[in-house]
Each structure stands twice: as C-alpha cells, then as structure tokens.
Amino acid sequence: MDKSFQMKIVDAFTQKTGNTYNSLYFYGEHQHTKAVVDYIIESYRTHHPEANILRLDAEEFRAESIRKVRSGGHYTIPTCDLFVLEYIDGVAGLEANEQRLYGILDWLLENNRQIVITGTAPTAAITNLAPRIRTQIDGGIAYSAAIGK
C-alpha cells in the first residue's frame, strides 16, 4: 500500500467520526504501527481539539484488568472519543481480557466512537483471538502499516 493511500484512509477516519470507517485495524512491525498511531492521534486532535483520546498498549490493558479484579471493582467503559489499543496480540487468548475488550468495543461502536487497534499480523493470523472480537475488528478497515506492503 502506498503512503498516499494510507494517509487518505487515516484522514477519512479522523475527519468523519462514527461507523463509516470504524474500526481501523492495522498491523506490522512496531515502528510502523507506532508511526501510524502517532499520525492518527495528531490528525484526530487537529480535527477534534476537545476530543478525549485513550491510548493503551496490551500490557496496560491487562494490568488495568488485573487491578480491577483484585480490588473487587467492576470494569468501566472508557468514555473517550478515540480508543487506541496497541498490539491486540497481547490480549488474545486471555478470556477475561477479551470479554472486557468485547464489551468496550461494543459500547464504543454503538456510541459512534472511533476505534484504532494494532497488531503484528492480520486478525486471521492471530489464531487465539476470540471470533467475536475478530468479527468486530474485521467490520472496519484493515491494512498493513508498512509502506509499500
């Protein structure tokens, strides 16, 4: 995919909120996905300066889940305009985390919030990813973050 097409996808995603381009999933090496996430957040802030953006990596997501369980608390749905989860591979196969993620993605989609998820490979290649989460992610746009791939 060439860079100009990739940027058109990101620009469309950040300018038009809601379900049209939701969710956005891209995969590849960390330096590529991080660069695209940085660009998405910068672009989103340009078009929506007051937006509440929540950016978590899989490790932070898991740690927050563990804290909630240990404290006896309930999972809360993040009230953000843009939810970014980096490296879904780190959540895949962990039932409690996947259950929480499914609820979050469901609420965000129903409430027309933007979702960005990254991974190391296409969702079909993440064999331990729960089918219902794969379906949620695959309902949007997916592409390789590596320019020219």
Give the positions of each predicted feature:
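Short glycine-rich substrate-engagement loop in P-loop NTPases that contacts/grips substrate
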Residues: 3, 45-82, 92-99
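Walker B catalytic acidic pair
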Residues: 86-90, 120
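Pre-Walker A (pre-P-loop) alpha-helix and adjacent loop at the N terminus of AAA/AAA+ ATPase modules
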Residues: 1-23
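P-loop NTPase Walker A phosphate-binding motif
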Residues: 34-49
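Walker A/P-loop nucleotide-binding motif
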Residues: 18-38
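Conserved ATPase-coupling elements of RecA-like P-loop NTPase cores
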Residues: 89-102, 126-129
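A short helix-turn-beta junction within AAA+ P-loop NTPase domains corresponding to the substrate/partner-engaging
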Residues: 129-148
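Sensor-1/coupling segment of RecA-like P-loop NTPase cores
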Residues: 104-131
